[in-house]
Amino acid sequence: IQAYFAATHEKDITLSPEAEQVAWKEKAKVTEAEIKQIKAAMRGKKGDELAAYEKQLEEATNKLPAPLPALYSVENDFKRATPIHLLERGEYTKPKDKVGARPLGVLLPDGAPERESLPENPRTKLAEWIVTPDNPLTARVMANRIWYWYFGRGIVATPNDFGKMGLRPTNPELLDWLANQFVAGGWQMKPMHRLLLHSSTWKQAYNSPAFEANMAKDPENKLLWHSSRRRLEAEEMRDSMLAVAGRLNLKMGGPSIMVPVDKELTSLLYNPKQWTIAADASEHNRRSLYLIAKRNLRLPMMDAFDAPDMQISCARRESSTHAPQALELTNGDFASAMAEAFAARLTKEAGTDPKRLTERAWQLATGRSPNAKEAALAAQYLSGNRPLREFALAVLNLNSFAYVE
């Protein structure tokens, strides 16, 4: 596979006029020379003298001109093609036989020949092989992933492994049919989303008339005879708490955001100054999509609720249950701040009447009115003149808030 990319090299296309590019290069050249001079002067320095040079280096680095707008692009340069070899035990310092461009041998018939030279458009040829009708694996894998996104479990429960070490499909005929639909639809995902959302399987409720009988036959719900109950994922949990508290910033686009964290976490970084908190506090309440993700600094909320750690590919998220989750939702800094904001919102929108407070809290957090038992418990709690913040925190810990049925 790597041989298909052996001749590929970056060639970004700068969008600025030539005169602007020349001016940018001149300014960058002067600043880079200054940085080089400071680095040479600070060698061997210690203490206050070193700190002074570090400050100069930071100031000089900040003077570097911002990158010019450009389009990321690549080109094929066969004269610079990198030779690809088999590696002994995967070590690049121990190359063995040279190999040509060819799909993975495990996916090809026995005796399939190597390609001696690169094709004219190697990446295009690889893409064509990936979607050829002779390779049904791609469509099956993609259809299975789309199914997993909606139902929490793929028809093949190991989305990254369709081989002998993976689990067998629970409904192979359905998987083949979905794969054929995907290909027939021009490999477009929107028709697949529409197909699944209009299906009777998607429209099922959690409670089934034959719940006990079906549970005896299929307790893991592999055949999806009812909808599966699932907990909100880490990002969904955070965004939902922000929305209920009235703090969610729906701003679109822009760079990733660094939010405030404990100093104990930033001190673990090689350079703690890398964690630059956004100056505008409203940016801290952006959707979790915009939170910066660092492998060596895990946000407590994300870590507790099984967000991927980005060390390895994550085809399927697990949903664990452990004590730190309860601690995060009751004593965590983020949960406490959201409870305060939620209580302030309830006071503003529902006043001090216990019945109105309860109704508004349930509507915001669960999308429904409280049942008789819930209303009675809430009324009993609020009649004790306890802090409204504690009531708001309890509502944010309801199963009806944290789980989707």
Model-identified regions with their sequence ranges:
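Residues that form or immediately flank small-molecule/cofactor binding pockets and catalytic motifs
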Residues: 6, 91, 294
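Hydrophobic/basic alpha-helical segments
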Residues: 292-298
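C-terminal, charged and often intrinsically disordered regions of DNA end-processing helicases
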Residues: 289-290, 307-308
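Primarily short, surface-exposed interaction patches in extracytoplasmic proteins
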Residues: 28-283, 302, 308-320, 330-389, ...
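Sequence context surrounding c-type heme c attachment/ligation sites in exported
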Residues: 1-36, 302, 314
